[in-house]
Amino acid sequence: MTVARHSFARYGYHGTSVDSIVKEANLSKGALYWHFKTKMDLYRAVLEAEVDKIKAFFAPTEEDMCCKPIDYLIDKGGEFFGCIAVDEEGIMLWMNLWMEARRGNEQISKMAQELSESLMQDMIDMVKMAFPAVSSGAGRLSPKELALTLSSCFEGISKNVGLRCDVDQAKRSWRFVVERLIEGGRSYAA
């Protein structure tokens, strides 16, 4: 899986061959196909493992439950940007997945949607739990809309770590986004 993860991250789905994976992993094709029927199944398994890592990373512990939800969201997001700086293959996997989906590959597009929905549902549940007023309709956005807005901003910042911003700038940007979305603030235009 490590070799497949590396190849899919660096070369994308179409740029990665089963031959290159088995050669690098020192496996036979038969051994690979024993576990995965197709290259697409292997790709899905790699991405599902990424989803599981992300969910585990953001799952609050009992200690986290003592924090203010906004602080938890800001701190965990910032910590994740540090992870991206160390392991950029994770973000590269997602960027390749989104690009392939945008290019119209229906199978990959469907998979991208399913994986994103899985992450989104966890985010919606977290928003409902952390910010009960949103669930009761107190805000302008529904829990799903708030989760989508937060995750879209988070993904945008994530894609820029190491390219257009460093980890500290990413953390500052994330703090700004979360505080503005959750707490509001005075207008910059005023």
Which sequence ranges carry the predicted segments?
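Solvent-exposed, non-membrane alpha-helical residues enriched in polar/charged side chains
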Residues: R5, A9, R44, E48, ...
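Helix-turn-helix
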Residues: V3-D41, A45-V46
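Amphipathic alpha-helical packing segments from all-alpha helical-bundle domains
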Residues: A59, C67, D71, V86-E89, ...
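Solvent-exposed, amphipathic alpha-helical segments
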Residues: V3-R10, F57-T61, L93, L97, ...
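Short, basic, alpha-helical segments at the C-terminal edge of helix-turn-helix-like DNA-binding modules
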Residues: E48-I54
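Short, flexible helix-adjacent loops and helix caps
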Residues: G12-Y13, K55, A59-C66, A85, ...
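Hydrophobic alpha-helical connector segments
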Residues: A45, A59-E89, G137-L150, A189-A190
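Amphipathic C-terminal alpha-helical segment
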Residues: C83-V86, E100-R103, D125, M129, ...
